[in-house]
Amino acid sequence: MFASYKSIQETCAFEKLSELAQSPYDLTQPGALQADNRLQRYQVAGQAFKLFYATEQVDDRVLAGLQAVADECQLVSQYRAMRTGAVMNKIDGFVSENRRVLHTATRDLFSGEPAEASMNSRAKRELEKLSHFLDALDAGEIVNEAGEAFTTIVQVGIGGSDLGPRAVYEALKSYTIVGRRAAFISNVDPDDVSMALADLDLGKTIFNIVSKSGSTLETVTNEAFVRRALLENGYDSARHCISITGEGSPMDDPDSYLASFYLYDCIGGRYSTTSMVGCVLLGFTLGFEQVMAFLRGAANMDNSADEVDILKNIPLLMALIGIWNRNFLDLSSLAIIPYSQALYRFPAHLQQCDMESNGKSVDRQGRAVQGKTGPIIWGETGSNSQHAFFQHIYQGTSPVPIEFIGFSESQRGKDIEVQGCTSQQKLLANLFAQMVALACGKKDQNLNKFFAGNRPSCLLFAKKLTPYVMGSLLACYEAKIVFQGFAWNINSFDQEGVQLGKELAKRFLREIGGEEEGFHGIESAFLNEVQRGV
């Protein structure tokens, strides 16, 4: 199936781009950012956002080469195939998951002709279930043992069941229904769980247990922790727990859960935020109307990613500029810096989504990849990050590309003017200053004050962070990650490295529990040595 698709190294444009990378656009030359209307020309508008990329080390020749890469690798054609239900999660000729990839179907709800009908109808059915469930909560039909309303929902899950929903909830916390909140339990660390439980009014709390298989080790363990706490405090856990799981899994049990919502094999955990994995939590805290706005934003960004012209397609252009930085300029990491405190958990979500997707060394035909794949993803909010690690970004020996995210208006609309400008104006001034300073640098005979410049960055900019805009932002990055995986000709939808760690953890647990008496492998030797004298 994938033999007809090229990786970037197999394209005709690869050699030309490699030549251009020997002398990339010099952002430090006088007037570099203003030459040829660069600031005006190097921007793309789409779905509430503008992408400004004049501060990247690209020029028209590079952009033409990247367009050729997109065309030769059939990036948009592969994206369309994914959206319409092609089996994209596979490795040709080798044992693999062999699944469709349909996270986009969970929000393809707003046109008469969805890209893929069967998964779309399931998504609509789950949303209808959620709407009825939320209505019953609001009407007082679902209450606790004392007849009181639930005020808190706790998401119990790990990986994609935690990071994406947590990032979006924190981003949209300003829109929460008065009197409702969310909390999260993810780590199997007992201290984390017990501290989370200590901060709750258990009687007014619903626990949302998320596991597609119904057997995820950390989640099953934490669910037992939660149920014990409920029992010890005199509560019926079946009246306080709901599940999001695969249909027919051990967690699809009406006797043990207040309600169950379904998650399907064609939706990977890191891409599941617009499924019930995120929507149940967001529906409880924000309300169903805001959930639909969030999904609409994601759906519209999905549709805009269907454009073949890279200068009209924000996620595709971001993906290709990222490939330019990674494969041609040999930049090994990428910092995500949102100038919005509401997005403080978003870099962690993107870290998982990107690195678990594209941290691969085998292509889709089971061969070793020919070049570099996904960069290391990290980040923090601005302007805090300026006072944490920007020293390294400015003057370190390893240049770090940055994707900035910003908004012209604050989310809550409360501000103060000090020294002639508002806090939001100060925030934006700092954002814009970083982009210009990183690009242009500063000459100084004192080398300790010398800034080399040519540190590439771009900016995703919108008016205000709303549920619609958050959905659009999430889908933008999902599409970007998928496009890059297609360009590298890797499977962005499995995580075999994670599976190996899980298998070995189970072997250690059997050794700790004495289930393999007489077995003396590396597990036994490792445990004996590490724990000796502790």
Curated annotation (Swiss-Prot):
It comes from the Bacteria. The active site is at 356 (proton donor), 387, 502. Its EC number is 5.3.1.9. Keywords: Cytoplasm, Gluconeogenesis, Glycolysis, Isomerase. InterPro entries: G6P_Isomerase (IPR001672), G6P_Isomerase_C (IPR023096), Phosphoglucose_isomerase_CS (IPR018189), SIS_dom_sf (IPR046348), SIS_PGI_1 (IPR035476), SIS_PGI_2 (IPR035482). One of its GO terms (molecular function) is monosaccharide binding. Pathway: Carbohydrate biosynthesis; gluconeogenesis; Carbohydrate degradation; glycolysis; D-glyceraldehyde 3-phosphate and glycerone phosphate from D-glucose: step 2/4. Signal peptide: none annotated. It is found in: Cytoplasm. One of its GO terms (biological process) is glucose 6-phosphate metabolic process. PROSITE patterns: P_GLUCOSE_ISOMERASE_1, P_GLUCOSE_ISOMERASE_2, P_GLUCOSE_ISOMERASE_3. GO terms for cellular component: cytosol. Its main location: cytoplasm. It catalyses: alpha-D-glucose 6-phosphate = beta-D-fructose 6-phosphate. Belongs to the GPI family. PANTHER family: GLUCOSE-6-PHOSPHATE ISOMERASE. Catalyzes the reversible isomerization of glucose-6-phosphate to fructose-6-phosphate. This is Glucose-6-phosphate isomerase. The lineage of its organism: Bacteria, Pseudomonadati, Thermodesulfobacteriota, Desulfobulbia, Desulfobulbales. The gene is pgi.
